[in-house]
């Protein structure tokens, strides 16, 4: 657990001096999340070791909660540094915003994802608020009610079919995911005869508006612009993770007309050690779908049975931004 803690906490700590001291400090979060992660993935051997799948990790939840609390501190600090009277010059503000966005997309997102799968209501609530403060609260319902049930099929908006580039995917999923999740939550509320105030989308939309209002009151219009830019950066990475990890993989239809059960061959995985620790083992994605409630340190990786990405997950996200390059690399792997 110590390695998870060190690799995830350090970039969060760097945001403080980046915002308050500026200078070279302003560039360290983005350097850590790009150059350092890439270099360390190259230097450290791929990690295919597996912990005991039945083992318990008492410290794992404490780290999630701590990183969840850090998310809100990092968000407030980054917005102030980018849009407030921090004394940073334009380049430093841009670098800080970019670094913070990467932290939210590659640390906050995997942490919030783990939290919304927990059985403890407080932990699920924390994960919901993490997504909500990135204006992506609907992802909670879409992920739990749609993605995990229909992954690898046309009913899951977040499972990209072969040949769909990321930009078309992003435009489609942004609309479909929100509307489908809201419809399902409304139907659940009606069946359960819950008052409208308990509709999850009241939290997602209301919480997002409250965050916007708080930023506006504190830092004005420039603060809102900075917040929206950082949130959009994080949202793109949230969508990118699903795009990369499920691109072109489809569940077969059985003789009885039903889809085959979700298996280890329905997600792309990456064995690269440093970025996997950074993202609390999110690149071990197949096992998460097969064993949804397995603690992240115990997620299994089997390169013989699970589809493997040719490069680390963050690098694959960059490649996906160039459709021709992405298709040339991934379509043959999908066909194989």
Language model region names:
Residues 43-56, 250:
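Membrane-helix interface/capping segments
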Residues 1-44, 59-83, 91-105, 197-240, ...:
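Alpha-helical bilayer-embedded segments of polytopic membrane proteins, i.e.
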Residues 1-16, 120-123, 127-128, 132-201, ...:
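Cytosolic/stromal cytosol-facing helical appendages immediately following the last transmembrane segment
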Residues 51-174:
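Intramembrane catalytic core of multi-pass membrane enzymes that act on lipidic substrates
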């Amino acid at each position: 657990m110590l390695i998870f803690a060190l690799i995830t906490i350090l970039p969060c700590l760097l945001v403080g001096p980046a915002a308050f001291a500026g200078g070279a400090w302003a560039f360290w979060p983005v350097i850590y999340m790009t150059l350092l992660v890439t270099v360390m993935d190259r230097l450290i051997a791929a990690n295919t070791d597996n912990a005991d799948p039945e083992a318990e990790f008492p410290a794992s939840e404490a780290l999630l909660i701590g990183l969840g609390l850090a998310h809100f501190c990092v968000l407030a600090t980054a917005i102030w540094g980018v849009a407030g009277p921090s004394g940073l010059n334009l380049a430093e503000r841009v670098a800080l915003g970019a670094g913070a966005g990467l932290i939210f997309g590659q640390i906050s997102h995997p942490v919030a994802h783990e939290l919304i799968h927990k059985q403890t209501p407080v932990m699920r609530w924390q994960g919901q608020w993490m997504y909500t403060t990135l204006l992506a609260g609907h992802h909670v319902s879409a992920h739990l009610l749609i993605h995990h049930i229909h992954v690898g099929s046309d009913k899951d908006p977040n499972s990209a079919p072969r040949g769909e580039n990321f930009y078309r995917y992003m435009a489609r999923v942004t609309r479909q995911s929100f509307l489908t999740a809201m419809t399902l939550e409304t139907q659940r509320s009606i069946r359960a005869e819950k008052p409208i105030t308990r509709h999850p989308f009241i939290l997602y939309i209301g919480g997002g508006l409250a965050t916007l209002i708080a930023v506006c009151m504190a830092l004005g219009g420039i603060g809102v612009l900075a917040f929206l830019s950082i949130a959009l950066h994080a949202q793109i990475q949230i969508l990118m993770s699903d795009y990369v990890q499920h691109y072109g993989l489809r569940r077969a239809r059985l003789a009885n007309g039903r889809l085959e059960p979700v298996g280890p061959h329905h997600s792309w995985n990456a064995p690269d050690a440093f970025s996997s620790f950074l993202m609390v083992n999110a690149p071990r994605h197949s096992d998460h779908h097969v064993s949804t409630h397995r603690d992240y340190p115990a997620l299994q990786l089997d390169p013989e049975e699970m589809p493997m990405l040719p490069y680390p997950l963050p690098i694959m996200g960059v490649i996906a931004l160039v459709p021709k390059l992405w298709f040339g690399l991934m379509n043959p792997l999908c066909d194989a």
